[in-house]
Amino acid sequence: MALRAVRSVRAAVGGLRAISAPSAPCLPRPWGLRAGAVRELRTGPALLSVRKFTEKHEWVTTENGVGTVGISNFAQEALGDVVYCSLPEVGTKLNKQEEFGALESVKAASELYSPLSGEVTEINKALAENPGLVNKSCYEDGWLIKMTFSNPSELDELMSEEAYEKYIKSIEE
């Protein structure tokens, strides 16, 4: 549901147009805009960090060469209430799809896999005291690790939100 809401907001924002109503006679302006002109507002990669997903239900967003990694809403719902997070130490080097930790819940335990190759630069210390953040806010406060990535082209191999939603539907059938 959260993914649908994000997509709806992005669709709405992408189509916004600003229209100014003339309050005085429309006189030519030196830069070519006139009162009543239509200007489109655009959002792009510079403004929105795109969330990418793996088939194992991890996600990653990137900003300034650092990736933030977490698990998807689908994964946290399947796990149930998370009661313990096992995360790597800062400085750990990871390869794409390498196991880097685990989440334990009241229902099951699940391994975590790195979406990219790189080095862990930070772990979410709040999860030690409150592992339930993974359930309450899997895309914001419940992130797991931050990492530099050594091969940016690996991002292209991950699924977009739309592709991930289709993937989820295909495995639920």
Curated annotation (Swiss-Prot):
GO cellular component, one term: mitochondrion
UniProt keywords, alphabetically: Lipoyl, Mitochondrion, Transit peptide
Pfam families: GCV_H (PF01597)
Localization: Mitochondrion
Keyword check for Zinc-finger: no
GO biological process, one term: glycine decarboxylation via glycine cleavage system
Complexes and interactors: Interacts with GLDC. The glycine cleavage system is composed of four proteins: P (GLDC), T (GCST), L (DLD) and H (GCSH).
Identification of the protein by name: Glycine cleavage system H protein, mitochondrial
Source species of the chain: Bos taurus (Bovine)
Underlying gene: GCSH
